[in-house]
Amino acid sequence: MAIPSFSMCHKPELLKEGKSEGQEEEGLSYEFQEMLDSLPKERGRRNRYLYLFQGFRCQAKEIQAITSFQKHFQSLPDDVVLATIPKSGTTWLKALTFTILTRHRFDPVSSSSSDHPLLTSNPHDLVPFFEYKLYANGNVPDLSGLASPRTFATHVPFGALKDSVENPSVKVVYLCRNPFDTFISMWHYINNITSESVSAVLLDEAFDLYCRGLLIGFGPFWEHMLGYWRESLKRPEKVLFLKYEDLKEDIETNLKKLASFLGLPFTEEEEQKGVVKAIADLCSFENLKKLEVNKSSKLIQNYENRFLFRKGEVSDLVNYLSPSQVERLSALVDDKLAGSGLTFRLS
């Protein structure tokens, strides 16, 4: 089956009435709400709370899903987990990884036919999120129907993931993007998915929240990046750390690196046949953006697939940020990443 098949087998009793002061989402269990009320919290965009959970900030519904995931997920030796912070190339990484892992079933060289799943399914359907799909709303999915190697995705920091992927054979691939372009992409995305009845988030407001680690969950972004970066240095056979800008500059070299890390290196025959280039072309931003499934379908609610594809460029910051904003974020990044060895190119 092209699209992963799973079923939901349990959902806890929900709290429908009499919400406490801190509850902003419906559908939270009594037990979970009690835990949530004990967490430190700060107001982020549109006055929505971000709760401090296991050392990072997250919205209530995300914490509910992460809690279910941590309690119930059982890894298998050949599992692959793709990790990103939001708006840093997640859709692209899913497409690339799925195509590499399934290339012997679905030939990317002959992908002009309608047989390849990427032509009819969004990458997020092919590689499901732990927190937004599988364990959303406290669900406990039956994953027995997933083909091997099972491939999942997450935005959670490594500290919240590590116990669930401690099996030495489980592979983790992390993709990050320079913080400037990540912010611009996130700002556009937030406004795209916001109801038309609600005013847009102004850039200056969003930028201030971003620099304070309050624009999106799973951060602050620098701690998210550093968690995976340090683990990749400590255990390079376990965690592969990739940069969006490097993939844009030399996709074929990075595809080979990714395939080798996953234990499925390209053969000389495949390279001569043009398999590497075919995967790069099939999964390119331009190709994915023009597919009907990515223009007209929806993930959930207001999350239309087309909002996942804006520009896919490097250094878009020059079109939006003032010199003082660039200076502020540059100083923040330099300070937070100092001594780590992690650096970014802006072009």
Curated annotation (Swiss-Prot):
It is found in: Cytoplasm. It is an enzyme of class 2 (transferase). Its main location: cytoplasm. It holds the Pfam family Sulfotransfer_1. Its EC number is 2.8.2.-. It comes from the Eukaryota. InterPro entries: P-loop_NTPase, Sulfotransferase_dom. This is Cytosolic sulfotransferase 14.
